[in-house]
Amino acid sequence: QGGLVTTAVGTVRAEMVVRATEAFTPSLPTLKRTLAPIYSLMIATEPLPDSFWAEAGLHERATFNDGRRMIIYGQRTADNRFAFGGRGTPYHFGSAIRPEFDQNPAVKELLHRTLRELFPAIGDAAITHHWGGAVAAARDWWCSAHYDPATGLASAGAYVGDGVGTTNLS
């Protein structure tokens, strides 16, 4: 209902209500088929020396991604770890989202292997962290933002992990 959100713990009234439920959108009965949750997983190394960052060409903290089948992305963290992620996890039937999907040993190994292929200077640096979560993909792969001034209802989503940085493109 426009201007009204009811939850298990109470009701909120507002002039505008924005639904930004991303990967959890399929849990809403009327929106079940609008977005598909896909998992993005990440690994992070132990802190790496400045010499690695210089050799890798990432000494100025550039971020990167590419468009291979397993979309990958990475960046240097504030404590000099290499945070590296990708989307090699399969879609789960019925748009299922479960905590156990946040980690996938096969994808973790694939990410580690890909990181070593792209940045051989990383050598045997230890992987100290591994995590993941669901992001939303529209079935046509187009992110969107909508607003209906008549009802005060708005929605935004399907940013496939690119998040707020791409909201101005919707």
Model regions and ranges:
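A conserved FAD-binding loop/helix module that cradles the flavin
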Residues: 94-102, 155-170
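Active-site substrate-recognition segment that forms the wall
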Residues: 2-3, 11-51, 55-150
